[in-house]
UniProtKB/Swiss-Prot annotation:
Belongs to the bacterial ribosomal protein bL20 family. Signal peptide: none annotated. The lineage of its organism: Bacteria, Pseudomonadati, Pseudomonadota, Gammaproteobacteria, Pasteurellales. This is Large ribosomal subunit protein bL20. The gene is rplT. Gene3D superfamilies: 6.10.160.10, Ribosomal protein L20. It comes from Actinobacillus succinogenes (strain ATCC 55618 / DSM 22257 / CCUG 43843 / 130Z). Pfam families: Ribosomal_L20 (PF00453). CDD domains: Ribosomal_L20 (cd07026).
Length: 117
C-alpha cells in the first residue's frame, strides 16, 4: 500500500473550521483546536436557541395580550377562554400585534369575549 499523506484534506478541514470561527475572540478564531471546540459549542447553542426562540416569543405574545386584556378589566385566561367560546380563531401572535398596534380592534375582541362569558 502506498503511504497516504493527509496534508490537503487536513488543511481543507482546518480552513473550514477557522472560517466558521471568524470573528471569535482571541485563540478561538486562530488556533484550530480551540476554534473547533468553539464552533461545536456555537452549533449546540444555535440548535438549543432555535427551539427556545419559539418559547420566548410565545411568552412575549402572552405578556402583551395579558397587559392589554387587563387594561380592559379582563385577565388573559378569561380572555382566551372567551375567544374560544366565541369561536374566534386568532392566534396569539396576531392577537399581540393587534393589542400593540390597534387598541380599538382589541377592545372589540375583548367585548366579544366578555359577551360570551
Amino acid at each position: 500500500m502506498a503511504r497516504v499523506k493527509r496534508g490537503v484534506i487536513a488543511r481543507a478541514r482546518h480552513k473550514k473550521v477557522l472560517k466558521a470561527a471568524k470573528g471569535y475572540y482571541g485563540a478561538r478564531s486562530r488556533v484550530y483546536r480551540v476554534a473547533f471546540q468553539a464552533v461545536i459549542k456555537a452549533g449546540q447553542y444555535a440548535y438549543r436557541d432555535r427551539r427556545q426562540r419559539k418559547r420566548q416569543f410565545r411568552q412575549l405574545w402572552i405578556a402583551r395580550i395579558n397587559a392589554a386584556a387587563r387594561q380592559n378589566s379582563l385577565s388573559y385566561s378569561k380572555f382566551i377562554n372567551g375567544l374560544k367560546k366565541a369561536s374566534v380563531e386568532i392566534d396569539r401572535k396576531i392577537l399581540a400585534d393587534i393589542a400593540v398596534f390597534d387598541k380599538v380592534a382589541f377592545t372589540a375582541l375583548v367585548e366579544k369575549a366578555k359577551s360570551v362569558l
